[in-house]
Regions:
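C-terminal helical cap(s) of enzyme catalytic domains, especially alpha/beta-barrels
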Residues: 1-4, 65-71, 198-218
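Glycine- and Gly-Pro-enriched alpha-helical subdomains that act as flexible
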Residues: 10-32, 45, 202-220, 230-243, ...
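Generic structural signal for well-ordered alpha-helices
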Residues: 114-121, 142-147, 180, 206, ...
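Small-residue-enriched alpha-helical segments and adjacent helix-cap loops
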Residues: 141-146, 150-167, 218-266
Length: 268
């Protein structure tokens, strides 16, 4: 289906820079992109290496919360608990003005971006937009929403919500990387929210989100390995060697390790 939309005048596809946004707490501005994780099933465990910045708990705040993680609740059940923030949908705009939270989230599909929504965002710079799309071309809709915000002169940060139903980690990785890659390279991403209804664990989904941001060179969370694929000029077992290197160095966050196997182009 056709996606109505126009490119923002200030956007340059040939040399994109990060979209100018007004920081709301640790989201937007000069901050690194955040990761929002789903825990609507009540589970709270996280991998210390890939701890999300925010956990969306839906309608029920868990009794035991992860230290250092803030929680997002639906606005109609949010009661102002410390370390929690409300999330509105576009039908709840009238309630937003009555809420005193210094950080608010707004779930918004592109086609719901009415004049009323634009007017609301102009008077509520504390709102972080969570862009949603069920369109076959979800990248196109996410882009259209961002370009509309830029055209209107709005500087609200935007987090991209991506919905999947995958049972294999590689399938989730490939699909979510494709969906998010262009948005990151265009400088439009202030955060990522992967929601998976398949059988994958939360730890896998969280690690995928952080991995995408690292691959996009926007946030580092683990050791990075750059290896040649191996060919007839490789005189040793490259895969086993890589596994040994990873086992010894995977805790060295921020380090980039190059692995060469070629007797012609590298020492091996």
């Amino acid at each position: 289906p056709y996606i109505p939309g126009m490119e923002a005048p200030e956007f340059n596809y040939l040399s994109p820079s990060r979209r100018k946004t007004r920081a709301v707490r640790n989201i937007g501005g000069e901050h690194l992109p955040v990761v929002i994780a789903d825990r609507m099933d009540g589970k709270t465990e996280v991998n210390p290496q890939f701890t999300p910045d925010y956990i969306y708990a839906g309608r029920t705040l868990p009794e035991q919360r992860e230290e250092g993680v803030e929680y997002i609740l639906d606005a109609d059940v949010w009661e102002g608990e410390a370390g929690t923030w409300p999330a509105f949908n576009h039908a709840q705009l009238p309630l937003m003005g009555e809420c005193s939270a210094e950080l608010k989230f707004l779930f918004m599909p592109y086609m719901a971006q009415t004049d009323e929504v634009i007017a609301c965002l102009k008077v509520h710079p504390e709102v972080v937009v969570i862009s949603q799309s069920n369109h076959p071309n979800r990248l196109g809709e996410h882009r259209a929403l961002l370009h509309q915000l830029m055209t209107e002169g709005l500087e609200n940060p935007v987090v991209f919500f991506q919905h999947y139903a995958e049972d294999e980690a590689e399938d989730l990785l490939i699909k979510s990387a494709v969906d998010m890659g262009a948005l990151i390279f265009d400088g439009l991403c202030d955060g990522i929210f992967l929601f998976n209804q398949g059988s994958l664990s939360h730890a896998v989904v969280d690690a995928t989100a952080f991995g995408i941001l690292q691959a996009g060179r926007t946030r580092t969370s683990k050791t990075e390995y750059i290896s040649c694929p191996g060919c007839g000029r490789t005189l040793y077992d490259l895969e086993k060697t890589i596994a040994r290197i990873k086992a010894a160095t995977s805790h060295l966050k921020g380090l980039k390790i190059g692995i060469m196997g070629c007797i012609v182009n590298g020492p091996g």
